[in-house]
Curated annotation (Swiss-Prot):
CDD domains: RuBisCO_small
Domain of life: Eukaryota
Protein keywords: Calvin cycle, Carbon dioxide fixation, Chloroplast, Photorespiration, Photosynthesis, Plastid, Transit peptide
Protein known as: Ribulose bisphosphate carboxylase small subunit, chloroplastic 2
């Protein structure tokens, strides 16, 4: 029995020493503010915000006669070399190229719904199948030439589809009709 009492006494002593090492010093009160400099800060943000110097160089997109398309629509039409570079980019990213065309309205419009959304009331027709396994950008441009030959008055766009995440990652207009 004596051995049991001595072992419990040792345990009690070790518990007390652990509790004492984690003790925190008592609260000593607030420090005096006389040693700190006092600076009044103006919280009115209207006094510091101004873009008056840049207003002269800003322009507004002219809404008449210039419809908005997909990505890069604010740029002039892409040249053949620029299209090739865009397609090479989407192939480097591992995306699947796909061509779509629209015969009537290649721009954003809302026919059946007034709220904005990704599709904005338009669905494009896919040209053939997505080009799975394509590694050469010139193959995509040959397909683009076929679409334009078959439907010269169509809007044609190239999209890059990520088949792993199952999302469309890039989309841009590759051809606009001559009449537009």
């Amino acid at each position: 029995m004596a051995s049991m009492i001595s072992s419990s006494a040792v345990t009690t002593v070790s518990r007390a020493s652990r509790g004492q090492s984690a003790a925190v010093a008592p609260f000593g009160g607030l420090k005096s503010m006389t040693g700190f400099p006092v600076k009044k800060v103006n919280t009115d943000i209207t006094s510091i915000t101004s873009n008056g110097g840049r207003v002269k160089c800003m322009q507004v997109w002219p809404p008449i006669g210039k419809k908005k398309f997909e990505t890069l629509s604010y740029l002039p039409p892409l040249t053949r070399d620029q299209l090739l570079k865009e397609v090479e980019y989407l192939l480097r990213k591992g995306w699947v190229p796909c061509l779509e065309f629209e015969l009537e309205k290649g721009f954003v419009y809302r026919e059946h719904n007034k709220s904005p959304g990704y599709y904005d009331g338009r669905y494009w027709t896919m040209w053939k199948l997505p080009m799975f396994g394509t590694t050469d950008a010139s193959q995509v441009l040959k397909e683009l030439d076929e679409v334009v030959a078959a439907y010269p008055q169509a809007f044609v766009r190239i999209i890059g589809f990520d088949n792993v995440r199952q999302v469309q990652c890039i989309s841009f207009i590759a051809h606009t009709p001559e009449s537009y």
